[in-house]
Amino acid sequence: MDSFTFQYPVKQYFGKGCLETALNAEMPKMGNKVMLAYGGGSLKRSGLYDRIRKMLEAAGKTVVDFSGIMPNPTYAKVQEGAKIARENNVDFILAVGGGSVIDCCKIVSIQAKTDEDIWSMQYGKERRMATDCIPMGAIVTASGTGAEQNNGAVITNEELKLKQPLFGAFNSFAVLDSDLTLTLPMKQVISGAFDTLSHCMETYMGRPAHTNLTDEINEAIMRNVIKNIRALIADPDNDFARGELMWASAMAENSILKLGKITDFQCHMLEHAVGAYTDCNHGAGLAIIHPTLYRHMLDEGAEKLAAMAENVWGITEGTEKEKAAKGVDALESFIREIGMPSRWCEIGVTDENLLRKAADSTVLTPGCAKRFTHDELFEILKETM
């Protein structure tokens, strides 16, 4: 394990029905004007919007709405939110939703405090990070991304045709109340849970390859995610399984699993590039790419793929490379078992030219066991059409 320094800023409120406790504790710290940020109409249809707004207003807060945050949030939406925050002198941002809402607000939080363009700042020659931000907190209604746990955000720049990470504010607190996920469509729940599994795999497959304490914690979380996805499919009202998946999502992205490692995340970077051109569902894209990408790195990644096969999928027979291959087969079978797609055509992506552009614009990650070329990434995308 490599050396590291660790300090973690996000306060966690976890548990069934913990929303009121969390907000009552945090509202006195929010200032007078709170921007309530959310996605579409489901928050209002479920009654959660009125519930949260009434609590804020009862505490004397002026509430400013920022709505319509889409899946795969755009940079234009970030600018819209920053404008609303500036014009209304917002003191605090309360993001209510899943990863897209929370990611968007992390960047709104810093863009609202500077006249400089955040994208140009972080991807320009100087590669500077903004330091001033509007404080924010998150109420999670769709787990899987772990977005509430860190300051990274994935934003689509439609003008540049890029879907890339930006870095903004940390949440001062996160509310993980499994009751708030009950109205979410099962397809979305499973997609989010697979994203959690992907985060774990992408961290596990990083460097150094030898297994350490954080890898062993990771193996336990992966087993837990697999078990609880199956439990939730068998019984969608299984609140225990929902809570377990919510906490697994948090654990996958609160940096614990990444201590002492350089993470892989080549699959994520490739999916982000495809998403910039197709606006595909993130979890679905990951499910399509993972098995084929791993087969392309069976030689270079055999040690960790074999360890994952044995310690996560229970495969004990065969040579290291044979176990690695069987583990990838087990992953692919699980993807089919839980109803996730395994081909781009299943989600309406059929344009090979777009996949070529996506491959060519993909960030090549230093933590991956294999140093892929853009041409080989394109071959992976073609094999999964």
Name these PLM-found stretches.
Residues V90-K106, T141-A147, Y277-C280:
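Glycine/serine-rich anion-binding loops at beta->alpha junctions
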Residues L19-A22, R45-L48, Y75-V78, S100-C105, ...:
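Short glycine/serine/threonine-rich phosphate/pyrophosphate-binding segments
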